Amino acid sequence: MSYDLLIRGCRIIDGESAPAYRADVGIQDGIISAIGPLPDAEAERVLDCPELILSPGFIDIHTHTDFTILINPRAESKIRQGVTTEVIGNCGSSAAPLCGEKLVRVREQNKDLVIDWKTLGEYCERVNIQGTAVNLIPLTGHGNIRSSVMGYDPRPPGREEMNRMLELLRQSLEEGSRGISTGLVYPPGVFSGSDELVELLSEVSRFGGIYSTHMRNESDRVEEAVEEAINLAEKAGVSLQISHLKAQGRRNWHRIESCFRKIEAARSRGMDIHCDRYPYIASATDLDILLPSWTWEGGSEEELRRLSEPTIRKRIRDEITKDDWESVIISRVATEKNRKLEGRNLKDIAADRRLEPVDCLFDILMEEELEVEALFFGMSRDNLERILKKPYCMIASDASAQADYGLLSRGKPHPRTFGTFPRVLGKLVRRGVLPLEAAVYKMTGMPAEKLGLKDRGVIREGAAADLVIFNQAKVK
């Protein structure tokens, strides 16, 4: 038999939690055609891999590559980690649908791109015309739907608005979306209530999709947030994915045990519920996450106006209780004049400016017109390992595809951008936190099952040949 590619003598981890075994693999037309001893096989290309491991390509179930893939379709920060499939559209924000205020805001935030689509179908056509190094599985951002219909108003939708939101969601699901995501700490998701969300989730359930949620709280009220996520999904009868499970802040580390109990109780009732996590103890998001949610009402222009008014600044200052400003590190700014702030913490920046850290926060947000990203330390390493060990936890980067050159090399991104999967396979597996087969399953077969992918995430005859070869002793 002749193949396009023959991989000889590799140690196979099949993505289904089975023990590793040694075999040859023959690949033809992008499909795994044969697995086993193939001593007489020929191929256009032969790889002899007796010291290496062959696994399914990794499925990154929580990413933000929606727009960066159009800047650089090579997705190098993902491909170099072994990622072959990404789930985009997380945390309530996706590339589509884009209407009304959402379209205006996305164009403002992505000046390096021509945003010439409005629907998911049009976005997918744009990506396919350009090409992409990774498979992309889209979710529909609840924030897109809500802001497309009713902007950033802090109120429940009226019946006509709700119907329009359902129409936009239904169209996206018909055009290939695998479900919906929420970002309930971000505008406009923070303004949404349970009735609105259950109605949308019920529509997703009818399509057999999933609900991925950046919960309403990940610190002082994380237990309530887990309960809310479970209740919403249970009422709607939809599969639940809790994004980047954590208990942020030392005073909340003990709360993770209660979160586990709630998740496991729901699973024991038959709920399809999982979570994901990156292998680091710092998170990353927009700097204005530190502001009270009412400052976001009405959109970015209103937020900047509030920051410019002394009396409102005082009110905001009085509501911010943060004191560990050294744990907040600026990772990316928009202007050249503040580039020197990247990689530095707010406490030190404030000292240089002879300001209180909270006033320094306000000034930086205004100088950058809110376009500031930051890293936030405050998670427990012990909790991290306990989360990753859970049989319902997958590995995810929570990062967009980046590069070390060009437009995507700006700033000092979270190391998860380039290091999530190697860190698990190298550091955590070698330390015995996870067995190798279990770690690979969390990156391959488990997310494939969650997403209903039949031909990805596994090594079996007839499956797509999205594969990764790595040296377990050296991966880092």
Question: Model-derived features: where do they sit?
Answer:
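Acidic, glycine-enriched loop/beta-strand segments at the rims
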Residues: I12-D24, V372-G378, N383-L384, G432-V440, ...
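Hydrophobic, small-residue-rich alpha-helical packing segments that form membrane-like cores
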Residues: C91-L98, V106-K235
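Metal-associated gating/positioning segment near the N- to mid-region
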Residues: A41, C49-I115, S219
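Divalent metal-coordination and catalytic microenvironments
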Residues: C10, G30, E51, H62, ...
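Active-site neighborhoods of metal-dependent hydrolases
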Residues: C124-V127, A133-N135, L139-V149, R155-R159, ...
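Histidine-rich, glycine-flanked metal-binding segment
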Residues: S2-G57, K476
